């Protein structure tokens, strides 16, 4: 199967929301009754505030993954918190000192999700390559993400390092990970 990556267009956001709903609970599906609110919270700010920083992975003409991002988290967070109810954010589990370090030393951030049946086929790697090429062009020095259980293995293989970790509930570890743009 051939997987390719392209910048998202206005017509792709429904599919991005579908993939988010099927992968948003630490890589597993979000409960059907909660999907609309979940995708609204996690996707809408990127769709409305930074749509040009989103890519999709496509296989057999279907969206199988996406990466939403921003080059400047401090500016994005200020705008997002003015425009929307910020609600829960995984970064809020980390101390202010950790958040400030992430946002200033590693100013870009992103979310990446790939449907379970397509993991291991290179979609995540291709999405990251697209992001990092754009970050390089924009002269952004580094990026961060907060990942849940199990996904940190992929990001470690992609040369991300753990800056901090926290367990907000027993059995769940969130990791703040960073990687410079070389």
Question: Over which residues does each language-model region extend?
Answer:
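Conserved acetyl-CoA-binding loop-helix of GNAT-fold acetyltransferases
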Residues: 120-134, 157
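A short beta-loop-alpha structural element at the N-terminal edge
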Residues: 4-18
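Conserved acyl-donor/pantetheine-binding loop and adjacent beta-alpha core of acyl/acetyltransferases
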Residues: 68-112
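Glycine-rich phosphate/pyrophosphate-binding loop shared by adenosine-nucleotide-utilizing enzymes
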Residues: 3, 61-66
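Conserved GNAT acetyl-CoA-binding A-motif
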Residues: 106-108, 135-148
């Amino acid at each position: 199967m051939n997987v390719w990556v392209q910048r998202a267009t206005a017509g792709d956001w429904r599919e991005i929301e579908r993939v988010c709903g099927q992968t948003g609970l630490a890589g597993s599906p979000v409960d059907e009754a909660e999907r609309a609110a979940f995708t609204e919270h996690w996707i809408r700010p990127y769709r409305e505030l930074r749509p040009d920083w989103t890519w999709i992975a496509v296989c057999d003409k279907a969206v199988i993954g996406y990466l939403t991002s921003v080059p400047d988290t401090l500016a994005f967070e200020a705008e997002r918190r003015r425009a929307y109810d910020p609600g829960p954010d995984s970064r809020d589990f980390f101390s202010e000192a950790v958040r400030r370090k992430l946002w200033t030393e590693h100013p870009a951030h992103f979310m990446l999700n790939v449907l379970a049946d397509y993991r291991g086929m290179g979609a995540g790697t291709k999405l990251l390559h697209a992001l990092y090429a754009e970050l390089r062009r924009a002269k952004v020095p580094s990026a961060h993400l907060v990942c849940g259980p199990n996904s940190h293995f992929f990001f470690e293989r992609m040369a991300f390092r753990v800056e901090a970790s926290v367990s907000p509930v027993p059995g769940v570890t969130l990791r703040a990970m960073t990687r410079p743009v070389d």
